[in-house]
Each structure stands twice: as C-alpha cells, then as structure tokens.
C-alpha cells in the first residue's frame, strides 16, 4: 500500500478511537438537548471538511472531482444532468415507468431534482448529503436510546459521528450517504410505531413511504426492512406490542406484501436471490483470471459466519483498489468493534435473553448481511455498509455489558483483529503468487 494511504488509515483509526473516547467521557452527563447539538454539529463539521478535502484530493490525483476508477458516481452525475431540463413528471416516467428496474432509480431522481437547483455543480449535492449524514447520527441516537438505553444510545451515536466509513461516502457522488439516512430514518420511525401505545395515519404512512423508498435505492434493503418489521411483530413481547395492535399491523403488513407481489420490486429481489450462486461463481472466476488462485476458498459459506466483523482492511497495493485502500482504516475499526457486537449478540440470546425486544433491528441486520454474505459480496465494504448503523448500536450495547468475564474475551480480541488483517493481506499476496 502507498505511503499516503497508510497515513490516511492511521489517521482514520487514531481519530476514531481518540475522539470517541474523549467525547464519550465529556458528553455522557450533559443535558440531552446540548448533547444533540454537539453531536449534530460535530458530525456536520467533519463531513463538510471531508467533502471539501476529497473534492480537492480527487481533482489533484484523478483530474476530476471523482474517485479512482469512478463508475457508478459518474453515471449518477451524467444521468442527473441529462434530466435537468426535463419536467419532474418526465423524469418520474423515465425512471419508474419506462425503465425495467427500480433499484438506483430513487437516487437518480433525487440528484435530478438537485440538478434543477444547483445546475452542474458537483460540490453542492455532496454538501446536502453531508447534512443528511449528520441527521442520520441524531436519528441513530434516538433509535439506540429506545432499544439499549441512554448510555448505549450516546455511545452508538458518538461512534456514528466519528465512524470513518460513514464520513467517507460524503465525498463521493454515490447513493450511500442518503441511503443510510433512509435506512436509519425507517428503522427509527418503524421502531417508534412498534413501541408506541397510540398511533396515527402519519405514524403509519411515514415508515411505509420510507421502506418503499429503500426499494428504489437497493431492492434487497427494502426486502430486509419488511422482513424485520414482520419479525418484530411476531416475536416482540406483548408488553411492548399489544395483541390488538399486533393484529392490525400484521394485517397491514400482509396487505402491503400483496400489493408489492407481482411488481417489479419483487421480481428484482427474486432475481437477486436466484442469482446469488452465479454472483459467487462469476466473482470467483474473475479473481482466478486475475491470478487470485485462492479465490475458490472465499465462498459465502466460509465468509457468512463472519458477517459482523467483515470487511477486512485492504493493505495490499492492488491496481484499481485505491478506494478500498483509502478506507482501510475504517474497516479495521469495524473489525475491532465486531468483538463488542459478538458480546451483545451472545448476551441477548443466552444471558439477558432480551432478544425479543431487539428483534426489529436485529432481524434487519441479520437478514441484510446474511443475504449479502452469501451472494458473492461478502467482503465488499460498499455492499456491507447498510448494516453498519445497527452494528454500531450492537457494539455500543456490548460495551455497556462489559464485565470482568467478557472483558477477557475483548483482550484476546485485541490480538485477533490485527492477526486477521495480516492474514487477509497474506491471502491476497499469496493468491496472486507474490511470495
């Protein structure tokens, strides 16, 4: 890996742990309103800085303000600029009626609307995304507080504020920042609906609208969101969801499922699941053709059990993987926090046995990461990213559960993480015949 990316990775790691530790101590007892102000503006400041920095960095290194080997981001930009002079109804028909796929249509529609306001400017849409990303951190706090308590909620939100992977995508013209906002907004509103004693038309329509929007960003995300909602209805304790409310919401869920059945959305999800073996095989063949002779061992069956820890950091200087090298520090942080996630999962299932009250967010991350892990994208940071907000909540919960017994596991985990990183680098080098 180049010296620049090594330094960048070190800054990501040290910055995350230093800022998270200091802010967790300083902000733990301040009033909630003050905490949320600190949280939002800290998150916004970091993201705006990264937007400007990455704009300059990419322009100097690639000649354009887009990432290395830009593909999707350039397509999104060109599509939105092409739609700029069209009417909103024409853009809608083009994206949602004339095209055969729903996934990605939502983000192109969003960028097309921004292009009507900002023209061909590249920086302004990214700054808007930075605002959405900072809002995501606040929504994550509300979701986490409701599920794991005030202490865990603050830790999870602080993690999200300084998490490198959640900052990184604000500097790109990709859908990830807005998609993460929609995910957390849906989870927060749907969780509120499930736990509230009273509900209104608006409280039902808003999460329904958000989940439909998720289908237009990544179809499997929408499917995982619906699955999580139904799972929570079935398994959550009656003290949280009354039987009458459970019946009404299940009826609504069944009606929504029938509405979606037979449409383009379900066809795309079915196709994604049916093609999972093809995805794995094609990826394996591609890697083998590039000289990766060990690719056959990186199957979904092998990688799926590690879905709470993946992806591993890329420390090997491989052509066309510069973006992965830039975010390697963030992946290392994810690997480290995975130890606390494992404590949280084990505790919820076998010690505190409160998994029913965590079934909504838990089933979402299990469903989504499970599908991705067996579909040929098990170490793809970008595909695993949508599960990160919930993993941060689980990691924060694991930290609140620390005691002398499980801390012994974490001390061992301190050594496991760097060993896994080196082993992955060894795998990549050896598979290419470089030693």
Please provide the spans of the model-predicted regions.
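Hydrophobic, aromatic-rich transmembrane alpha-helices
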Residues: 18-22, 308-355
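Short hydrophobic/aromatic helix or loop-helix immediately within or flanking a transmembrane segment
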Residues: 71-120
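Transmembrane-helix signature of polytopic, membrane-embedded enzymes
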Residues: 123, 140-162, 358-359
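Transmembrane alpha-helix segments characteristic
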Residues: 44-47, 206-209, 353-373
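Membrane-interface helix-loop-helix junctions at transmembrane boundaries of multi-pass membrane enzymes
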Residues: 146, 196-202, 322, 344-365
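Short acidic/glycine- and proline-prone juxtamembrane loop motifs at membrane-interface regions
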Residues: 171-178
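Membrane-interface alpha helices of multi-pass inner-membrane proteins
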Residues: 168, 194, 202-225
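Transmembrane-helix motifs of polytopic, lipid-linked glycan transferases
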Residues: 18-25, 127-147, 340-347
